[in-house]
Curated annotation (Swiss-Prot):
Subcellular location: Cell membrane
Entry similarity comment: Belongs to the binding-protein-dependent transport system permease family.
UniProt membrane topology term: Multi-pass membrane protein
Keyword Cell wall biogenesis/degradation on entry: no
Protein name: Fructose import permease protein FruF
Lineage: Bacteria, Bacillati, Actinomycetota, Actinomycetes, Bifidobacteriales
């Protein structure tokens, strides 16, 4: 009985150590430790009576991670179908531009939010239609949309960086990015709820299984009764919609859209978050929980860069090194090497015991 319990315990530990999610969490904890060493008040929390929420470096990081959670969730679904969505950063800019411009023109704030979300959904649907029904390559399709999106944002704002901070009645949109729910940043809470809802949709229905099946083999999935074109269309539409939410998070925080910088390079951050979370770029099985942790890690890396005072010129290199280290920590070969070393030590100890 004791041996069976020990064997079950060993199997649990092996599964835990072989999980990408485990190593992602370990990486996050290490980054927190590094930040705490260099910034002693990193984990310090205080109550801000003006905002009605908690304040501190960790809270600021959670606020920033909300936008990454959104685009990483959409990107996870797209990548699991063996696709890619390079347009998410530009969709953020277009959605933000639509919200700020309509608000500046005197439109009701709730209608401005709906228009921004509709624009993101529409771009996602266009991507989905081109990839699924016309059979265009996802990389080329979304690359073109990435370039076109910036142009659309400039057209909407007439090339200006629209500011809606002084517009009356913009409080709901401000709260969307800067408000608090039970002391926790509202945008982070909203993002987590959306991730959970998408996760439930994928795991409590057949949707998740169908997405994975399409990513593994479209022809085989079609033979089992799945309609790959509809699945592909759906995941790109979801990605566009979630990118629009991320765009609102980004622009509402300052009530201003920068048509060049809003969402810039965030498609790369989304892909990195998905990879860190353990979803293969080849498609198939995916982990929304892993991608969520990966998104928070991306925000944590950016916070670490600021805390360590890394030069702006060296920031991309530092970012790349940290991501590579995290990916190496998750590599199956590293796990196998560690397991083999432990096995050899156990055999040596057993041999010594027998010899004695």
């Amino acid at each position: 009985m004791a041996e069976k319990a020990k064997a079950e315990g060993n199997n649990f530990v092996k599964k835990l150590l072989s999980s990408n999610l485990t190593w992602s969490i370990v990486a996050f904890i290490l980054l927190v430790i590094i930040c705490t060493i260099f910034q002693h008040d990193f984990l310090a929390l205080s109550w801000n009576s003006n905002t009605g929420g908690l304040a501190g470096p960790l809270i600021t990081m959670l606020q920033e991670s909300a936008r990454y959670l959104m685009i990483a969730t959409g990107m996870t679904l797209v990548i699991s179908t063996a696709g890619i969505d390079l347009s998410v950063g530009s969709v953020m800019a277009v959605a933000g531009a639509a919200a700020m411009q309509t608000l500046s023109n005197g439109m009701n704030v709730w209608l401005s939010i709906l228009i921004a979300l509709a624009v993101g959904l529409a771009i996602g649907c266009v991507n989905g239609a081109l990839v699924s029904f016309l059979g265009l390559q996802p990389f080329i399709t979304t690359l073109i949309m990435m370039l076109a999106g910036r142009g659309m944002a400039k057209v909407i704002t007439s090339g200006e960086n629209t500011d809606a901070s002084a517009v009356a009645g913009n409080e709901p949109l401000k709260w969307f990015a800067n408000g608090f729910i039970l002391g926790i940043p509202a945008n982070f809470v909203i993002a987590v709820i959306i991730v959970i809802l998408v996760g439930l949709l994928c795991r409590k229905t057949a949707m998740g299984m169908m997405i994975e099946a399409v990513g593994i083999n479209q022809e085989a999935s079609r033979m089992t009764g799945i309609k790959p074109k509809k699945i592909l269309f759906l995941v790109y539409a979801i990605s566009g919609f979630l990118a629009a939410i991320a765009g609102l998070f980004a622009t509402a925080s300052v009530m201003r859209v920068d048509v060049v910088k809003t969402g810039q390079d965030l498609e790369m951050y989304a892909i990195l978050a998905v990879v860190i979370g353990g979803t293969s770029l080849l498609g198939g099985k995916f982990s929304l929980a892993g991608s969520a942790v990966g998104a928070v890690i991306i925000a944590m890396i950016r916070k670490t860069i600021i805390t360590l005072g890394v030069n702006a010129e060296a920031t991309p290199a530092f970012f790349a090194v940290v991501v590579i280290v995290i990916c190496v920590m998750q590599a199956p070969k590293i796990h196998n090497l560690s397991a083999n070393m432990k096995r050899k030590r156990a055999l040596k100890a057993q041999a010594k015991a027998v010899a004695a």
